[in-house]
């Protein structure tokens, strides 16, 4: 959903809740201020303090994002969408695993390295299997590492899957991962993936954003989750840790086994087509609005 929220839930939103939420969350005590460039930080801080912070009372609210409660065995979830006319049997099947925290730079680089090795190009083992199977039309757009939240998520799957092929897709992915671990990964692939990761992490241009903004956004997760943002900028130390660990036998294979294969916090997700999905949803919303409207007073 976009920032407007879920229309069905907006019906239940009260004015008091909205005001309280705004008071609690939209407060400078929750803000992180960045400066970049050849500027005098003291002058910027004085300006912010005079024009912003002095206009507010300090807030005692502690805003923090808790880690997801871990599940002890994989969970299967099915949701629905309204398909295009030619996609009535177009199922999306995705397996996703919850990993470590995104604001830990070594954990983040490890996870990126594993994802790159498995999925970066057509020669990568998991991508090769997914691209060459007849079980689906193409890779799911959810495939890869999601690093925009507090905890990392690794996902792999297909779109264009027949209704009766979900279990086959799950078996295909899990068997591929097990084969990668048992057969081993070539040092050439590992070093190539590491080299590409270093280039990408150190890249100054190419993202379409100013370099200063890139740095700020890379530091933001650590700021939001009460960690040291300077650790994120110290790429050399983090890569040195990774390179040192790569000297151990089967380091990447062990990571794949630990983070993915033996990780019970897995969701087997299926997005299934339903040509009546939109009409059903609109009916539910209309019924809620009608019920709500009947109970409204003039003061409401």
Question: Locations of the language-model features?
Answer:
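Charge-rich, well-structured scaffold segments of protease-associated domains
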Residues: 1-65, 88-94, 99-110, 116-300
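Polysaccharide-binding surfaces and accessory modules of carbohydrate-active proteins
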Residues: 62-77
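Short, low-order "capping/linker" segments at domain edges
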Residues: 73-83, 201-205
């Amino acid at each position: 959903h976009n920032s407007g929220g879920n229309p069905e839930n907006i019906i239940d939103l009260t004015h008091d809740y909205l005001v309280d939420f705004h008071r609690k969350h939209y407060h400078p005590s929750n803000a992180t201020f960045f400066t970049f460039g050849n500027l005098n930080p003291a002058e910027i801080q004085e300006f912010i303090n005079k024009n912003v912070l002095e206009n507010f009372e300090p807030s005692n609210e502690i805003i923090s994002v808790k880690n997801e409660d871990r599940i002890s065995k994989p969970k299967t979830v099915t949701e629905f969408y309204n398909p295009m006319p030619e996609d009535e049997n177009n199922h999306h099947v995705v397996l996703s695993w919850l990993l470590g925290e995104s604001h830990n730079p070594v954990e983040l680089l490890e996870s990126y390295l594993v994802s790159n090795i498995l999925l970066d190009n057509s020669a990568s083992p998991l991508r090769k299997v997914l691209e060459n199977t007849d079980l689906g039309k193409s890779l799911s757009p959810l495939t890869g590492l999601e690093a925009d939240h507090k905890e990392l998520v690794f996902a792999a799957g297909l779109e264009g899957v027949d209704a009766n092929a979900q279990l086959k897709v799950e078996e295909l992915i899990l068997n591929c991962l097990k084969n990668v671990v048992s057969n081993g990964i070539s040092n050439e692939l590992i070093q190539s993936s590491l080299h590409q990761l270093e280039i990408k992490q150190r890249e100054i241009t190419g993202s379409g954003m100013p370099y200063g903004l890139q740095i700020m956004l890379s530091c933001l997760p650590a700021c939001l989750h009460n960690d040291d943002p300077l650790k994120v900028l110290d790429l050399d130390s983090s890569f040195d840790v990774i390179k040192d660990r790569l000297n151990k036998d089967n380091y990447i294979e062990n990571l794949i086994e630990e983070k993915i294969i033996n990780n019970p916090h897995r969701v087997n997700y299926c997005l299934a087509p339903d040509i009546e999905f939109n009409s059903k949803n609109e009916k539910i919303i209309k019924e809620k609005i009608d019920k709500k409207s009947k109970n409204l007073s003039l003061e409401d």
